[in-house]
Amino acid sequence: MTNIRKTHPLMKILNNAFIDLPTPSNISSWWNFGSLLGLCLITQILTGLLLAMHYTPDTSTAFSSVAHICRDVNYGWFIRYLHANGASMFFICLYAHIGRSLYYGSYMFQETWNVGVLLLLAVMATAFVGYVLPWGQMSFWGATVITNLLSAIPYIGTTLVEWIWGGFSVDKATLTRFFAFHFILPFIITALAAVHLLFLHETGSNNPTGIPSNMDMIPFHPYHTIKDTLGALLLILTLLALTLFAPDLLGDPDNYTPANPLSTPAHIKPEWYFLFAYAILRSVPNKLGGVLALLLSILILIFIPMLQTSKQRSMMFRPFSQLLFWTLIADLLTLTWIGGQPVEHPYIIVGQLASILYFLLILVLMPTISLIENKLLKW
């Protein structure tokens, strides 16, 4: 009798996606982040659901409802900090996953890559609206500053901002709709992740060498399931360590002060995972220019497959491209640091130089060095 996992309509889909899936034999641990992102998503949805049972999306009670979760709900503090730090782990995995794709040329699977960019934008939107919900000082002022950026759009800007706010300032209507968005977006992300996998399984995975994987494939289970389990255990260990020993390490102390529209915090800044984009936004003296630079800093990912000039897919055997890649990583870390600093000398000029270098590396230097490498190899 044929195994049920190969005949049952539902089991067959799962079997072809996670059990009998042909996988390159030589993929490294950098390929673990896809499954880790799935684990992060499940964790966030479960903890988020438990939090939503006790949270009230109303300006007068939101802050105290979060305090109530932490003080009075059984293990509420644990669920709340798992959710907050889970978001940080989500972004660490996301950035590692994107970095892997850039290094090994996985972006040449264009449909998978484009859905991935959509996923990144959806996760960023979810994290932003979620940060507003505790209704602390940084929640309120972060929402005010970021939504206000839309007013830079010519002609319709102001109307658009007031439409998103549901009034003339960030208030009760804004909080209610942000809670609605924060609840629905993870399910949209889940659907997009399924499409992302669908497109990936059409082509099969890339591998570190960048050459076609068809020559040497192994079944996903048990080889990569056991490997992914190790990654999952390390992720859970890190998340638990962060949650239990340093729950507020990545948060902002200002968010423990209830939102007050009459008092502006000294330094308004987003969570650490948005700081690089925030630094690019602040580096441009013009409001509309800053907003465009902010958008382009993320949307530039869409154009990366078009900027591929190398005859080799992966950077594994391209030392000059590797040097520029790690320069880009260092530049992003610099931007992240600058985003958390006040707007004063020397941070302003360092941020501007790092922003210019970011776009220069992606749009000019990396495609140029790839052409030079082709020449050196007489290709």
Curated annotation (Swiss-Prot):
Ligand binding (a ubiquinone): 201
Molecular functions per Gene Ontology: metal ion binding; ubiquinol-cytochrome-c reductase activity
Keyword Metal-binding belongs to the record: yes
Residues annotated for heme b b562 binding in this entry: 83, 182
Cofactor note: Binds 2 heme b groups non-covalently.
Membrane topology listed for this record: Multi-pass membrane protein
UniProt cross-references to Pfam families, sorted A to Z: Cytochrom_B_C, Cytochrome_B
Cofactor(s) it depends on: heme b
Keyword Metal-binding: yes
Keyword line: Electron transport, Heme, Iron, Membrane, Metal-binding, Mitochondrion, Mitochondrion inner membrane, Respiratory chain, Transmembrane, Transmembrane helix, Transport, Ubiquinone
Transmembrane segments: 33-53, 77-98, 113-133, 178-198, 226-246, 288-308, 320-340, 347-367
Miscellaneous note of the record: Heme 1 (or BL or b562) is low-potential and absorbs at about 562 nm, and heme 2 (or BH or b566) is high-potential and absorbs at about 566 nm.
Protein name per its UniProtKB record: Cytochrome b
Species of the source: Orcinus orca
